[in-house]
Amino acid sequence: MSATIASLRESLCSETTPLPIRFRALFSLKHLAVQNKGTADSLSAIDAIAAAFASPSALLKHELAYCLGQTGSDAAIPHLTQVLEDLQEDPMCRHEAAEALGALGKAESLGVLQKYLHREGEDVSVKETCEIAIDRIEWENSEERKQEKLRQSDFASVDPAPPMPEDDEKQTVETLEKKLLDTSLPLFKRYRAMFALRDLASPPDLPTAVPAILALAKGLKDESALFRHEIAFVFGQLSHPASIPALTEALSNLDEVSMVRHEAAEALGSLGDEEGVEETLLKFLHDKEKVVRESVIVALDMAEFEQSGQAEYALIPEVASKAS
């Protein structure tokens, strides 16, 4: 293991390291795992990320699972499967592990995802995530996928669902909003509409950007907490000021589930240089929900980073310079 990876692993796994530093270490390790795919360094980085699943922080663990899903590496599958199978684990982490297995797109994960989709008494967000992940893996390995024409996205993330294909009639914000909010459609199809709307909102000066943001914001009223949290996540990716009112409302609603509120806090962190955002986040620094408190700490660190003009939210200079 390289000295860099060993040092990042130590920062990530230490409970005495401040949470924002642990997050930066995590993003640095994810970057190294992706850049060096297939090498011993990549495997060491993946093992380093997985080692932090011993942490008591649900926020950190759910982010570990997300990052493992973004590595594109089969070496992450056993770690993620173990988290999904651990019924003592926080449902937020288990859901993220299921989503990450979907992102990796390997048919070998279908069995375990089917198991928890149909498990009696399973948490709804875990069930729904398994349903979407199964659909994503089946799509990933289908003939249909090869025929589809997908718009080039501005985002490098591997998403829970691809955007709607471009050849699916003429895509307008209105037609996509209709699909987004149609609860009779499978979640996978609605997610496809969500990511197509995201892509119509970037770059932020597109004429479709603000209408797409306002359409997405309506999804924050959906009955599915999983769906609402994904809308907040997309807003974090877009960092568009038009989403601030909807995100502030979601974070401020104490009756909203913590899975959604924490995602809204992190999304606001990506908008940290906008007026009033830091003040909003500071109000929730002592929230009753630990995951919200921790998200606010990370969001405030991200806000500081946004204001500083640094190139990349990572820990080590060489990762920052490579990633920028």
Swiss-Prot record:
Main location: cytoplasm
Function: Catalyzes the hydroxylation of the N(6)-(4-aminobutyl)-L-lysine intermediate to form hypusine, an essential post-translational modification only found in mature eIF-5A factor.
Gene name for this UniProt entry: lia1
Protein name: Deoxyhypusine hydroxylase
SMART domains on file: EZ_HEAT (SM00567)
Residues at which Fe cation 2 binds: 229-230, 262-263
Binding-site residues, Fe cation 1: 62-63, 95-96
Gene Ontology molecular-function annotations: deoxyhypusine monooxygenase activity; metal ion binding
Ranges in coiled-coil conformation: none
Enzymatic class: oxidoreductase
Organism per entry: Neurospora crassa (strain ATCC 24698 / 74-OR23-1A / CBS 708.71 / DSM 1257 / FGSC 987)
Cofactor binding, note field: Binds 2 Fe(2+) ions per subunit.
Pathway: Protein modification; eIF5A hypusination
Gene3D superfamilies listed in its UniProt record: Leucine-rich Repeat Variant
